[in-house]
């Protein structure tokens, strides 16, 4: 059955034990064959699902349920029995390499049906496969609701396509399956029992039921065919040659046939698996593995970093963290400046005048009115800063309206002289006035410049605009002179009348 190998001589290892490098592995020989791939015994005892925490019974139920879904979907899709058998064998092979916890068995079953239909040259659309599995999931005896073509359907379709690629990659594109269907008919012809239709059909049925077990990934198809014929003959009580045993002629052993028959008969005494219960168990294991993975990384289940220490240290329990800012505490500069400000300025909400702490009132000047307007701002931030005396911005506040000057009495004159602002504050007020005047003058210059520029642009477009402007200016001057002459004449007449 083997086609050959890549070494120079057939069935001889390469010289000097030099293997063939494929990827990151070194292989001594490469055989191209159409034989079924047999899983070794060491991989059967510890499957990936068992390593993830699933028990043997749960894994067996999941395998049986997945194969039943593939068989039922193939019947509804009108696939040949060979295609359904190929899908079940691929399903069994894949989950001896991957875990049921990390891969959804229903998505993998859809991908196996889709892939098997292509292998056996009877392809079906992915949409039809998804619709059939949706119908089977709703259960028998219940009203079937059609699948809505929404975002959930698109996600399922993409998952099926990705699962099909994953199966091909994991199996190394060795998805050919040699089925024992033809072998059964050939062996019965050798035994001269091919005319017994009951025996042929019973052996065929046992072979289809054996697809739910691991027999097709553990034994050769010839051994499986002999076991199915042996089991059907025992049930129907049909005698077959026993001295020597007839199956020894076809290369099968008594131990292998016995194991295949026992595993097949266990299916009929086994309780039917419940998909909801199995899905809940798989989900629990998935959550447990995710929490264990996050715990190994030092994170909580919600993804936040976990800090494990003896004293139960937490950044929030730090007594004096540099990020904790107490609003009641004030800087030493504000504590020093606060009594001075209280002594200089005591606000009166009634008349806007400034009181000293001894209760005496005097009329405030221009500088005090500016400080009062800043301190009575609506913003609490500005009020706090102006009250503490640590912030003074004169450009952002407009001066208060001037009050009418009153002639003070001699006693109040002495008080005002004593509390009169210094020369520096007076010069600062002059500086402010000069700044405001310079700003207003600069604004007027900008306006005049823009007006002249606009005129020049209009004049550049054509001389008729300049002519119109001159005529308009002359008419305005003429009208203004007329009004002035009338007003002068009116004044003169009124004088003569008087």
Curated annotation (Swiss-Prot):
Q: What is its main location?
A: nucleus
Region ranges (Cyclin-like 2): 182-266
Q: Where is the composition biased (Low complexity)?
A: 388-402
InterPro entries to which the protein is assigned, alphabetical: Cyclin-like_dom, Cyclin-like_sf, Cyclin/Ssn8, Cyclin_C-dom, Cyclin_N
Q: Where is the signal peptide?
A: none
User: What Gene Ontology terms describe what this protein does at the molecular function level?
Assistant: cyclin-dependent protein serine/threonine kinase regulator activity
Region span, Disordered: 294-498
Polar residues composition-biased segments: 311-320
Listed GO biological process terms: regulation of transcription by RNA polymerase II
Q: Which CDD domains match?
A: CYCLIN_CCNL1_rpt2
Cite the residue spans of the region called RS. 366-396
Q: Under which name does UniProt file this protein?
A: Cyclin-L1
Q: Which organism is it from?
A: Danio rerio
